[in-house]
């Protein structure tokens, strides 16, 4: 299993409960696909450098997880079609040297 991290930006006009539900939806997707969530860090609402889909700010979330490339591909597919996510980036973390 490889280490990945995903940062995604949620629409700022969602209620707090809806924002929490979006985060839980993606962490549940990772575990359902056989991955393991190691860290969830909600950075909160921040101003973006430029306008994205007519939004000047967004709710930032960082999730670190372990999984196969198939887990990352499925997560990317779902993030891409989600209306609540305005931007995302999945990166593979380097393995720690022993």
Swiss-Prot record:
An example Gene Ontology biological process: translation
CDD domains assigned: bS6
UniProt-listed InterPro entries: Ribosomal_bS6, Ribosomal_bS6_sf, Ribosomal_S6_plastid/chlpt, Transl_elong_EF1B/ribsomal_bS6
UniProt GO cellular component terms: cytoplasm; ribonucleoprotein complex; ribosome
Keywords: Ribonucleoprotein, Ribosomal protein, RNA-binding, rRNA-binding
Pfam families reported for this sequence: Ribosomal_S6
MF GO annotations: small ribosomal subunit rRNA binding; structural constituent of ribosome
Function of the molecule: Binds together with bS18 to 16S ribosomal RNA.
Family per record: Belongs to the bacterial ribosomal protein bS6 family.
Entry-linked NCBIfam families: S6
Protein name: Small ribosomal subunit protein bS6
């Amino acid at each position: 299993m490889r280490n990945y991290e995903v940062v995604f930006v949620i629409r700022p006009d969602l209620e707090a409960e809806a924002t929490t539900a979006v985060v839980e939806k993606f962490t549940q997707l990772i575990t359902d696909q056989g991955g393991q969530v190691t860290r969830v860090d909600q950075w909160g609402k921040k101003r973006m450098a430029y306008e994205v889909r007519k939004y000047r700010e967004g709710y930032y979330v960082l999730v670190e997880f372990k999984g196969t490339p198939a887990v990352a591909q499925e997560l990317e597919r779902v993030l891409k079609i989600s209306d609540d996510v305005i931007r995302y980036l999945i990166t593979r973390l380097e393995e720690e040297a022993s």
